[in-house]
């Protein structure tokens, strides 16, 4: 049954059927060909998969991100980044990375981060001497910090599938997210030296204070969200609702960047994005059930045990597998498909579930930067008007440093685990 589902899924994917329907249709048709599985499981899984309190956080965070973007958050975050890192070698490239880090704490989505920040800063990078391909790659890699630095929609879905603590996984993403940002900045610095791209004038203390004052309300939002979750004042789902109210009040009454007439359009955009995400969750739920029914995780464990008993080597093998999967399947879908398969495998080897979850999320996110899927990369290429050949020359250096950081996380799990252990 599972083999039929796999084959049908890839056939539908190849002929251009959207991934949510590819997963759902492939699994449904596979169920109908089996005498062992009741068709009732289809309705049960479709309903139960999205009838989840934790998944209610998705529409809330989608909406809060749209409200904050409409409220002029991007411009204010850019001003903060310019004030603090604009003078460094590479100038606007460093500002782009800094802004993406700040925006990641608001959006929780790679596509939202990339589109919002890239639209403003990719043209600026090009005007400051960055080649088209390099500007596109910098923003694609920096924008992909959205699902790693909390809040993260990918992490919320992973935890809803596996039962892990959303708060712990959020905390685990902080330090690796900053380390990856520093890695991206290091490669950007080397390219800036090569192309002789200098920094801007160093901001005065007064200019830094002014930038912080103007953007303070934007920066405070992730502090409220994460602080509330960690302190136990509210759940991740409730934090999403609070984020919506906060973003609405700030954008409508304080920043006054949008009016009441703009709200329906913002809500519709968030609803469309939420619907897409939940359709993928529902479609993948039948597939995930078939994976468990056919005992695929147990089969994988028995194969891997025959290869090695070293958990670090197993992690590296799983990362290679995830890189391959992430190149062909969009990050959210890949997470839903492989999390139920690989988490039991990691548990068999005594790998910390939070560490494994974080490594999986990071690997799938950055595998998704590469062609042929390359969602965020194609967004930035469109903004930069860059061709694929202009991008491919710069991509390996950035992905190389990120893969090194992933390997570091495998061998030094304390990098990701120290903060959740300190807080929880």
What are these model-derived regions, one by one?
Residues 1-424:
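Alpha-helical transmembrane segments of multi-pass membrane transport proteins
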């Amino acid at each position: 049954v599972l083999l039929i589902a796999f084959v049908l899924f890839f056939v539908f994917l190849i002929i251009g059927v959207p991934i949510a329907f590819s997963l759902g249709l492939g699994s449904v048709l596979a169920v109908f060909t089996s005498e062992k599985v009741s068709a009732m499981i289809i309705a049960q899984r479709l309903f139960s998969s999205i009838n989840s309190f934790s998944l209610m956080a998705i529409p809330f965070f989608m909406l809060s991100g749209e409200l904050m973007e409409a409220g002029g958050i991007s411009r204010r975050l850019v001003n903060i980044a310019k004030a603090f890192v604009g003078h460094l070698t590479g100038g606007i490239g460093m500002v782009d990375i800094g802004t993406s880090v700040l925006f990641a704490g608001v959006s929780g989505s790679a596509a939202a981060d990339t589109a919002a920040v890239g639209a403003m800063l990719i043209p600026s990078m090009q005007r400051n001497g960055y080649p088209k391909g390099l500007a596109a790659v910098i923003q694609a890699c920096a924008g992909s910090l959205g699902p790693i630095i909390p809040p993260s929609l990918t992490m919320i879905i992973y935890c809803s599938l596996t039962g892990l603590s959303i708060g712990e996984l959020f905390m685990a993403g902080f330090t690796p997210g900053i380390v990856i940002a520093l890695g991206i900045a290091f490669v950007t610095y080397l390219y800036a030296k090569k192309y002789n791209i200098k920094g801007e004038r160093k901001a005065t203390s007064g200019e830094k204070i002014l930038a912080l004052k103007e953007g303070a309300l934007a920066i405070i939002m992730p502090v409220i969200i994460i602080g509330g979750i960690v302190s136990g004042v509210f759940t991740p789902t409730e934090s999403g609702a609070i984020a919506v109210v906060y973003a609405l009040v700030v954008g409508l009454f304080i920043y006054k960047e949008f009016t009441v007439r703009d709200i329906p359009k913002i809500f519709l955009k968030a609803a469309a994005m939420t619907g897409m995400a939940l359709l993928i969750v529902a479609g993948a739920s039948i597939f995930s059930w078939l994976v468990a029914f056919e005992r695929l995780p147990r089969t994988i464990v028995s194969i891997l045990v025959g290869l090695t008993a070293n958990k670090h080597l197993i992690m590296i093998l799983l990362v290679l597998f995830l890189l391959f999967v992430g190149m062909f399947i969009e990050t959210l879908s890949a997470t839903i498909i492989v999390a139920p398969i690989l988490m039991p495998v990691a548990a068999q080897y005594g790998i910390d579930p939070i560490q494994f979850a974080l490594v999986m999320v990071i690997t799938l996110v950055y595998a998704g930067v590469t062609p042929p899927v390359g969602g965020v990369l194609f967004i930035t290429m469109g903004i930069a008007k860059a061709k694929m050949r202009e991008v491919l020359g710069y991509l390996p250096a950035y992905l190389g440093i990120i893969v090194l950081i992933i390997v570091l996380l495998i061998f030094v799990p304390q990098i990701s685990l120290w903060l959740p252990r300190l807080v929880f």
